[in-house]
């Protein structure tokens, strides 16, 4: 059930510290749980290179320290390399979330650059991984994780499990044996393909959406996070990013999300995951990092 706050308290948004640039819905894979339904038939949306460049400029001007490029598959967007380089020239910290299926040398050169970190998802042994991605992708992703480690590229990996009883420990052990230092476990979220046709609702959110972070979609729509895209709070084609982040629509969306979280019972949290939808977390402190894909968080935008 979605909880609607009848009279939400509108408060000014605190300084945003992180923005997802959700570039595309195109992806080589077609993961059964993909939170935004990306796949081979997806598009890059209506945002142009100029639009994304303006968003980066506005993010830097607003004092936002870092961005994550995500999708879909970032490496399939023709303007992604230019946009990443531009973000770096602005002094923004950059994380690229990739499935690491096909990475050419130009992309490796970019990944090795100062100020760039890498993130990916992993689903376990070969058969389990390929079942999720619906493609024979396991060998490619695993090999490229190892290549990133050997190249000393900072990389974090989210182990995604669909069974609440699965701790993901075997996959974590495998990744750590490869040399990955940052490995977290998270559970599938009830959005996109994983929603099984159900309408999205706030019950599947962690409660920290929009709290110091926001997401910009391929059509320019801004939402509190990559999982809450139906809670649009503005569009960067119509208004500056900073104005949207500090606007009343974002504050109201945050209030609705907070009210939803505060009204549901707490049953604790899953393995290493502060916000799996199979758990009912208590409201997080203001400095919590329970945000999908946020560096250092267990939440993954691939879920």
Model-predicted regions and their roles:
Residues 20, 24-27, 199-202, 218, ...:
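Residue-level signal for mature regions of secreted extracellular proteins and peptides
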Residues 14-18, 180, 211, 270:
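Sequence-level motif detector for i,i+2 pairs with an aromatic at +2
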Residues 1-10, 15, 228-303:
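Flexible mid-to-C-terminal extensions adjoining Fe-S/redox cofactors in radical SAM and related proteins
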Residues 34, 38, 59, 136, ...:
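Alpha-helix boundary/capping residues
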Residues 25, 32, 204-207, 223, ...:
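Secreted/extracellular small peptides and ectodomain modules produced from precursors
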Residues 1-109, 113-114:
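Conserved alpha-helical substructure of the radical SAM core
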Residues 50-54, 89, 109, 143, ...:
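Polar/charged alpha-helical tracts
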Residues 109, 113-239, 243-246:
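Radical SAM enzyme [4Fe-4S]-AdoMet core and its adjacent flexible, acidic
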């Amino acid at each position: 059930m979605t909880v609607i706050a009848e009279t939400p308290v509108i408060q000014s948004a605190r300084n945003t510290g992180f923005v997802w640039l959700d570039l595309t819905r195109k992806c080589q894979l077609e993961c059964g749980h993909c939170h935004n339904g990306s796949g081979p038939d997806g598009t890059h949306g209506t945002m142009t290179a100029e639009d994304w460049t303006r968003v980066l400029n506005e993010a830097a001007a607003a004092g936002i320290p870092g961005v994550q490029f995500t999708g879909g598959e970032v490496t399939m967007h023709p303007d992604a390399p230019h946009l990443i380089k531009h973000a770096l020239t602005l002094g923004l910290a950059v994380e690229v979330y990739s499935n690491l299926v096909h990475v050419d040398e130009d992309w490796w050169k970019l990944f090795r650059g100062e100020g760039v970190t890498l993130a990916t998802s992993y689903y376990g042994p070969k058969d389990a991984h390929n079942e999720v991605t619906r493609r024979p992708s396991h060998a490619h992703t695993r090999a490229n994780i190892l290549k990133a480690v050997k190249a000393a590229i900072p990389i974090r990996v989210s182990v995604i499990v669909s069974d609440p009883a699965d701790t993901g420990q075997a996959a974590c052990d495998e990744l750590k044996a490869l040399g990955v230092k940052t490995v977290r476990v998270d559970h599938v979220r009830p959005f996109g393909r994983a929603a099984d046709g159900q309408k999205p609702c706030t019950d599947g959110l962690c409660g920290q959406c929009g709290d110091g972070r926001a997401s910009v979609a391929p059509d320019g729509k801004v939402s509190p996070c990559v999982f809450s895209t139906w809670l649009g709070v503005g569009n960067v084609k119509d208004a500056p990013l900073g104005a949207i982040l500090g606007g009343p629509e974002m504050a109201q969306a945050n209030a609705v999300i907070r009210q939803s979280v505060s009204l549901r019972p707490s049953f604790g949290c899953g393995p290493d995951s502060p916000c799996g939808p199979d758990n009912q977390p208590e409201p997080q402190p203001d400095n919590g990092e329970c945000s999908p894909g946020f560096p250092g968080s267990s939440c993954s935008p691939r879920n």
